[in-house]
């Protein structure tokens, strides 16, 4: 059911280079009688993660930020130093009637390499670790189940090292990180790292695009 191509993962991999605000981590928000849900993933640079998940049908918004560390109100510079314990993450607000958490997990695992510890492509450090921060026990169950099935599938020679932890606090990243790929497509990192990943993602998930 979850047969994946190792080549796809290796081709889709790699992100790095105001005022910070702690974000409410409630699982749901209500808008016009539709209950939205949230998912929080780390898969390398949050510019890459944001660029991919923004294009999915059912995704309302994607917010880059930091989670998983002990430092309060972390800055991008501090997180990049690798001393805060935080990972670069994207917090996704989505409509569960249009896209499921399972589908988000599928996109998550198919657009980065979950077998490289604290590393995605050329980006190295704990801030780039593969991680799922669950909001509910159901999300935890689904993430662990999917991870186990992938591990048993033999898709990779190396073990999956994706961390699955409860989300305690989420800190919104500085404003210039938002819509970074959309606003900086001439940037070399965007052209040579993010764009190829986005293009491959579009081919694999063509039926799920907005």
Set out the residue ranges of the language-model regions.
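Bacterial N-terminal signal peptides
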Residues: 3-14
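Flexible coil/turn and secondary-structure edge motifs
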Residues: 15-210
